[in-house]
Amino acid sequence: AGPPTSADLRAAGWAEAVALLAAASGEVGTVTSPEGGSATAEVDGEGIRVTVRCGDPLDATVLRSYCVGAAHMAWSWVTSESLVVDDEGVVHDLTVRSFDVVRATETPPIEVTIEPDDGEPCNGSDAVFAAVAAATWLTRGAPETWPTGT
């Protein structure tokens, strides 16, 4: 049972595959989403640095905001988020606070570079999400369990 979910959610399924491939190869490289957006990410003690290419942005400010949000979501997903279940695997608390989402003020600085591209606009933030998740996990040494701790 459990809460309802969907494969339509941000990078569901393929972001995990990207992280596993990065752990196996020891590097993230360029991540390309099914929609065609691509991203790279570096994570270290200085912060999170992202490049994104996803066609000619409709609005660069909005794209940058989506990418910052995706990077924050990925960092939090790998380092602190979890669901608490009972002995039967039933979730009893689905509040934002119960997920242990990293507060924005506790997230490393995020730098986004939008690479020039005159192609048709497409979703780039999902590629950012997957790239940052993989880079965060690699930076942590690819431990066997998530969350890895902040």
Segments from the language model and where they lie:
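C-terminal catalytic domains of large/alpha subunits in multi-subunit enzymes
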Residues: 1-150
